[in-house]
Amino acid sequence: MRTPLPALLLFLCTACLCTAGLAQDRSLTLYTSLAPTESGPLAQAFEKKTGIKVELWRAISEKVVQRAITEARARRFAVDVVETNAPEMEMMAREKLFAELDSPYLADLPAAAVPKHRMWIPDRMNFFVVAYNTAKVRREELPKSYLGFLDPKWKGRIGIEATDAEWMATLVKKWGGEAGLAHFRKLAELRPDVRKGHVLLAELIAAGEVQVGLTVYNANAESLKRKGAPIDWLPVQPVVARPQGIAVARNAPNPKAARAFVDFVLSPQGQELLVSMGRVPASTKVRTHLNDFEYTVVDPITVLDEQDKWNKLWEELFIRAEPKR
């Protein structure tokens, strides 16, 4: 049967209109704090799947925020997708840098980790776990909860990372004000070894300089373990989870490509790729031993709104009393 000419013309015009926008978006620019060894393969997998080229700029989270905000205020709209720590993502959302997100994979994410405004959504997680040197500490020695580390026998054996006030804030709120504060005052009396940098803390545990770390990212410990280092980790309860977020810039030059990239990262393929590189997926559909336990999610809004309060307390308890290194 012949197709009437007017109907054929209408179909062709509609197809052209639908693909015109996609045809223009043949590249996108990503700002991220994800290490090049992981962000690179993620970008390459997306390019292979879609043919859309990813221009990658990687820096620490503070520099990602600084560049994104500076460019937006100067009305230089260069970035399409931003990916970094949740508190920094919330900071940029408040500057109205992002567009509201919708994704077919939104339902796969833990509801507690998704902000109501959806200007950014979590794509991976950092879990604060207990890591230990397997040559110096037996797994059976470790307490089942953080309360057990108040035992004086752990004095001189435990370490924490220097910037983890959000971990403390989350646990204090979970345990209840006074009880939570009392716990951290007692922990401070044990004078834990304070080190700057989560990667460094994990490396010091593997080297035996710190026997047990209370605020180690499990992905960092897992990475060293896979390389044969004498380190392992345990999800001592309560486990605190800090989301890492991804967003499309409000004035993205390539919005369709940007949204396609976000969907790819959140898809089972993207999340499985993160797992293969030792990262923890945000998706509840992708299970791994790296996320197969209960956890409490850091509230990035609280981190921002109450950061002075918690940073001051953290400084008083753990930093000022610590000898200079």
What are these regions (language model features)?
Residues 240, 249-303:
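Mature extracytoplasmic/periplasmic domains
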Residues 157-237:
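Ligand-binding pocket segment of bilobal, Venus flytrap-like solute-binding proteins
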Residues 24-90:
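Early extracytoplasmic/lumenal segment of secretory-pathway proteins
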Residues 77-82, 99-130, 147, 157-158:
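A structural signal for short loop-to-beta-strand junctions that line the ligand-binding cleft
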Residues 129-136, 172-174, 242-257, 273:
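A bilobed periplasmic-binding-protein/Venus flytrap-type ligand-binding module shared by bacterial periplasmic
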Residues 92-100, 111-118, 223-235:
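Ligand-binding "clamshell"
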Residues 288-325:
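Extracellular/periplasmic bilobal clamshell ligand-binding domains
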Residues 108-111, 126, 185-188, 192-195, ...:
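Periplasmic-binding protein-like
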